[in-house]
Amino acid sequence: ACVGENQQCADWAGPHCCDGYYCTCRYFPKCICRNNN
């Protein structure tokens, strides 16, 4: 399963972002998915 926009994700091991999203840790310590666009 993948997670969508503003959902918590992890760069190293799941959950991973759905297609069209990337994981950012700008909001450390919580990493969230953001739209690629």
Curated annotation (Swiss-Prot):
Entry's family note: Belongs to the neurotoxin 07 (Beta/delta-agtx) family. 03 (aga-4) subfamily. Aga sub-subfamily.
Name of the featured protein: Mu-agatoxin-Aa1d
Tissue: Expressed by the venom gland.
Source superkingdom: Eukaryota
Lineage start: Eukaryota, Metazoa, Ecdysozoa, Arthropoda, Chelicerata
UniProt keyword Disulfide bond, yes or no: yes
Sites of Asparagine amide modification: 37
Main localisation: secreted
Tagged with keyword Ubl conjugation: no
Note on domains (UniProt): The presence of a 'disulfide through disulfide knot' structurally defines this protein as a knottin.
Listed GO CC annotations: extracellular region; host cell presynaptic membrane
GO molecular function: sodium channel regulator activity; toxin activity
Location(s) in or outside the cell: Secreted
Disulphide bridges, residue numbers: 2-18, 9-23, 17-33, 25-31
Pfam family, one: Toxin_7
Protein's job: Insecticidal neurotoxin that induces an irreversible spastic paralysis when injected into insects. Modifies presynaptic voltage-gated sodium channels (Nav), causing them to open at the normal resting potential of the nerve. This leads to spontaneous release of neurotransmitter and repetitive action potentials in motor neurons.
Keywords linked to the UniProt accession: Amidation, Disulfide bond, Ion channel impairing toxin, Knottin, Neurotoxin, Presynaptic neurotoxin, Secreted, Toxin, Voltage-gated sodium channel impairing toxin
InterPro entries given in the database record: Beta/delta-agatoxin_fam
